A protein has these predicted regions:
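Conserved NAD+-utilizing ADP-ribose enzyme module
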Residues: 23-24, 40, 44-166
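Glycine-rich loop/turn
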Residues: 1-29, 37-47
Length: 166
């Protein structure tokens, strides 16, 4: 199975990096099975860093990756109650830790962030946010949280993506 990582730099040898900006599933290495989503991430990162181009790095993983007996895997099939709890814990609770090697599920896009921010600042309740989330078609993200999980990523290629100026 091919996975894509969008950034402003090529990433041949991914690492688990901690950041002050924690993603939906925590600190780690984010990929997607959607080239379209990776292209979007690459353009966003290029604009954030004022780079002329973004980069999509392509990886291959075994088709059976999510069933591997030595990996702790969490799968969210949709943006539901459990997904919302997990994402909010990662966003809000600096002490929150999970012990999954891999997490896969919907990626929070701009529309989802508007909903999450509304929930966090009290302008929308949980039921309203969950109802809105059900109407969104969301790309996936496959998150590598441990060094052990990164061993399954095999570098394939890199695509440089010219980006429009903001």
């Amino acid at each position: 199975m091919k996975l894509y990582h969008g950034s402003h730099v090529e990433v041949r040898n991914p690492k688990i990096l901690t950041s002050s900006r924690v993603g939906d599933f925590g600190s780690g290495f984010y990929t997607t099975s959607s080239m379209k989503q990776a292209l979007r991430w690459a353009e966003i990162r290029a604009q954030q860093t004022k780079s002329a181009s973004g980069v999509v790095t392509v990886f291959e993983v075994p088709d059976s990756l999510f069933e591997h007996p030595e990996l702790a895997v969490k799968t969210f099939s949709q943006a539901d109650d459990d997904w919302l709890d997990f994402v909010l814990a990662n966003r809000q609770d600096t002490a929150f830790e999970h012990h999954f090697d891999l997490v896969r599920g919907p990626v929070a896009n701009d529309r989802v962030y508007v909903c999450l921010n509304a929930l966090e600042n009290g302008t929308a309740d949980r039921a309203t946010v969950l109802r809105r989330l059900k109407t969104f078609v969301l790309a996936d993200q496959i998150f590598f949280h441990t060094a052990k999980s990164l061993l399954f990523l095999e570098y394939v290629s890199t695509e440089v993506v010219p980006c429009s100026k903001p």
